[in-house]
């Protein structure tokens, strides 16, 4: 093919190519923004820690409502724990209730909470767990550990978040 018999200029094809390039650039830009935004906001890359934050928030909401059975189910990640209480003989519901009322980490029943920030911790790409920082009963800081492998919660977390 020579310049003298080149195909005719197709305006629609060029417009489509330009639109696809702009769209691809916008998607890549949005992905970068979401990735960095989640990390900077303290919710993990691409907001990957949000499920753990929601679980901790649900746990505290159950404690505020004095629904200790539901809170225990969330804490142990075992919604059917009443079917097999022998699995939790090392940490039964009675001890759990005492630990989260009169002997709670804030030395009082939980009446309010706010999830502030979370950080991935441990080995691997997304870590073995997540430390979720919350303020309970006003301004008391509490750090909960969310174990990725089994979905259980633990208090206290292995360590506190620095700079929080």
For each predicted feature, which ranges?
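Short solvent-exposed beta->alpha transition segments
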Residues: 58, 69-135
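Prokaryotic Sec-type signal peptides and long signal-anchor helices
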Residues: 63-64, 100, 130, 147
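Short, low-complexity N-terminal intrinsically disordered segments enriched in polar/charged residues
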Residues: 3-61, 65
């Amino acid at each position: 093919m020579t310049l003298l018999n080149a195909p005719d200029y197709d305006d629609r094809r060029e417009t489509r190519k330009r639109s696809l390039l702009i769209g691809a650039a916008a998607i890549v830009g949005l992905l970068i923004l979401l990735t960095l935004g989640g990390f900077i906001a303290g919710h993990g890359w691409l907001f990957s820690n949000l499920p753990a934050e929601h679980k901790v928030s649900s746990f505290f909401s159950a404690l505020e409502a004095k629904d200790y059975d539901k809170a225990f189910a969330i804490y142990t990640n075992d919604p059917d724990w009443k079917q097999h209480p022998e699995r939790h003989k090392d940490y039964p519901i009675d001890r759990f209730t005492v630990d989260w009322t009169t002997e709670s980490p804030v030395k009082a029943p939980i009446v309010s909470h706010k999830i502030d920030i979370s950080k991935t911790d441990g080995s691997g790409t997304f870590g073995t767990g997540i430390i979720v920082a919350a303020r309970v009963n006003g301004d008391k800081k509490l750090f909960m550990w969310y174990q990725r492998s089994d979905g259980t919660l633990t208090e206290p977390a292995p360590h506190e978040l620095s700079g929080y």
